[in-house]
């Protein structure tokens, strides 16, 4: 066992003495040492219950003859960080989480680990660490929040964000906004739609690193606690088997995950996180792979924000395994999973408990919601290295759009103009200097996109940015434009009133300005330098382009 490096032989008597000081017995010294990597925090609804989930994991480890050791990681709530300087720290926290896990796992020489996680950048950080340290690893995601219920219908946090714009335009009252605020988020769990947190939970299951059914088992469901305990039991077996993370996850596993992502209409943040995770597994996942697979992967379920179903509907319809069963002819079925069985064997064992709900919520490949997957990668003279859009959440009439640029050098500038009502039908809002280096930190633009939606402009106004979006964003919103403005990308050359052409079916994003005029602008170009101190200052120096997953170089 790896942990014998800390506890076996006469030379390790001092090490054992310290372990005995924390209560480890002689008999336990002979057992596998299992880390329980817990991102529990009191800041985040998606994490508030993870202390209890971790206790269930530890019980499972003990049941199977292992010794659990729990430690914690940091976690930023994107929803609470939204719309202000705090959001600059969200994406950079991904690498900080990964680093701290590596330090603890390698420093203490753990035999295996169960990672208890939830929410947007935290789960990717855990997955990246799993690839880097390459020991037996299982991920237990915390599960979705139940939806709220307002005006006789289910709702979620995005309704509150969009309510801000609706209130500003006079469409709803301050009293109604307060009602939404009070009732849309009703307890523990990650936000109730197919936003980034739940998308990444689905990716984890599709990659084979969670037990089947884990992604959609809700935070308040006893099923989650049972799965946590089963994960604790299974990790001890995996240590005995020598089944490490890199023996499970391959290029083909990532293809499976991307197909699930495309079929469920997942968050565009997967185009950052999956390449970054692949990098830590020693693999390369080019952005173009999303386009390649999108052409042959239909969109099968209308989940918020790209539909009216919530995660509870998806869970009752069978969750990720139900989607994989629909996609069975397109998946790599021989890939291993943490169950010890293959993807195909797991699908064969999956039973549809609610056939009517399954048929209502999840379409067939023959009659999908959309022939193509949820995400498209656009390129052109405005995004030579690529940009991304959740096309499944765009109204058909806005798949192609041409309009004048309204240019802003920060989210705050754009938000002020939007809320004043100065954005008109047909406009293309440009928010730049929000990229990985330019922000720095690549903030999410959920506040401006939700304001546009709340003001009734979602089907007539586009927004493009070198920043990124929440998984809750809907509409013609194109992000991750690369190269970013800070690095001299064409988005930095746009002037007020320039015509921008968006063509999602053809995967094009064009600035309708002659190359001669653009060259004149390049000569005069000087990037905006936003102040950055501490961690963000270091991050700016080492982060790569969004087209490469914003990994560190």
From Swiss-Prot:
Record keywords, A-Z: 2Fe-2S, Amino-acid biosynthesis, Branched-chain amino acid biosynthesis, Iron, Iron-sulfur, Lyase, Magnesium, Metal-binding
Binding, [2Fe-2S] cluster: 119, 191
Gene3D superfamilies assigned to the protein according to its UniProt record, in alphabetical order: IlvD/EDD C-terminal domain-like
Top-rank taxon, per record: Archaea
Cofactor: [2Fe-2S] cluster; Mg(2+)
Modified residues (N6-carboxylysine): 121
Enzyme Commission identifier(s): 4.2.1.9
Cofactor details (free text): Binds 1 [2Fe-2S] cluster per subunit. This cluster acts as a Lewis acid cofactor.
SUPFAM superfamilies linked: IlvD/EDD N-terminal domain-like, LeuD/IlvD-like
Pfam families tied to this protein: ILV_EDD_C (PF24877), ILVD_EDD_N (PF00920)
Metal-binding recorded as keyword: yes
Catalytic activity: (2R)-2,3-dihydroxy-3-methylbutanoate = 3-methyl-2-oxobutanoate + H2O; (2R,3R)-2,3-dihydroxy-3-methylpentanoate = (S)-3-methyl-2-oxopentanoate + H2O
GO molecular function terms attached to this record: 2 iron, 2 sulfur cluster binding; dihydroxy-acid dehydratase activity; magnesium ion binding
Cellular component GO terms held in the UniProt record: cytosol
Catalytic residues, chain numbering: 470
Enzyme class, UniProt record, top EC level: lyase
Binding site for Mg(2+): 78, 120-121, 444
UniProt record similarity statement: Belongs to the IlvD/Edd family.
Job description of the protein: Functions in the biosynthesis of branched-chain amino acids. Catalyzes the dehydration of (2R,3R)-2,3-dihydroxy-3-methylpentanoate (2,3-dihydroxy-3-methylvalerate) into 2-oxo-3-methylpentanoate (2-oxo-3-methylvalerate) and of (2R)-2,3-dihydroxy-3-methylbutanoate (2,3-dihydroxyisovalerate) into 2-oxo-3-methylbutanoate (2-oxoisovalerate), the penultimate precursor to L-isoleucine and L-valine, respectively.
Name of the protein: Dihydroxy-acid dehydratase
Source organism per UniProt: Methanococcoides burtonii (strain DSM 6242 / NBRC 107633 / OCM 468 / ACE-M)
